[in-house]
Swiss-Prot record:
Name assigned to this protein: Probable transcriptional regulatory protein Lxx10750
Biological classification of the source: Bacteria, Bacillati, Actinomycetota, Actinomycetes, Micrococcales
GO molecular function: DNA binding
Organism of derivation: Leifsonia xyli subsp. xyli (strain CTCB07)
SUPFAM superfamilies reported for this sequence: YebC-like
NCBIfam families named among the record's database cross-references: PRK00110.1, PRK12378.1, YebC/PmpR family DNA-binding transcriptional regulator
Amino acid sequence: MSGHSKWATTKHKKAVIDARRAKSFAKLIKNIEVAAKIGGADLSGNPTLVDAVQKAKKTSVPNDNIDRAIKRGAGLTGESIDYTTIMYEGYGPGGVALLIECLTENKNRAAAEVRTAMTRNGGTMADPGSVAYNFHRKGVIVVPHADGVDEDAVLVAVLEAGAEEVTDLGESFEVLTEATDLVAARTALQAAGIDYDSADAEFVATVTVQTDAEAARKVFRLIDALEDSDDVQNVYTTLDLSAEVQAQLDDE
C-alpha cells in the first residue's frame, strides 16, 4: 500500500505553478461553477462541490468569491455557465506523453492556445486515443503533514474505504484510490479527524518515461505554457523523475 509512487514525483513543481495566484483562482472558481451547475448549490448533497470548495479554500480563494461562484453555477444569479470539457493529447520533449484537460466556453480558442503552446515549446499534438491509454482515472487526495498524522494513521483511516496506496511526498501524503472510491476515502479521513488539502479525480500515468534534467526542464516549461491558458485546467504527463534528476531540479 505504501511506498514510493513514480507518478507522484511528476508533480513536484505543482506548488510553483499554483503560485500564479490569479490563474489558479480563476480555474478553481470555474471548477466550483461547474460542480454547482451539475449537482446544485447544496453542499450536503453535492460531494464534487464540497471538494471544489475545499480546494479553493485551501488555496486562499476568498469566501465571497466562492459563494458567488456557487450561485452562478447553480443558476441563482441569472448568469449562464456553459463550459465544455475537452481532452487534447500530445508529446513533449523526451517522448513524454501529455494529456491536456480543458474546460472552456470557446472550443476554437482552447484548441488554438493549446496548439500554440505545444508548438512553441517543443511539443507535438497527437491523434485522439494515441496517448490517453497511458493513463487511468484515479482518485487523488493530498493530506498535509501535521502533528499526530503519520503515514500509518492515514493508511488506517482510508484502508477500508478503498485506498490503493499512501505515499509520503515529504510535505504531504498522497492517497490513491479508484475514482469511484474518492468520496468514501475523503469521508473516512474526515471521520478520523484528518484534514486534507484536496481530493480530485485525476488521470494517473500507468506507463512512465524517465528523462535527463534538461529534457525535464523543457517538459516543465511546456506545462507552464499550457497552464498559462485560462482554458487549460490540468496537464497530466508520463514523466518520471529519477532521484538524481529530482535533486538537480530541486537545487535550481
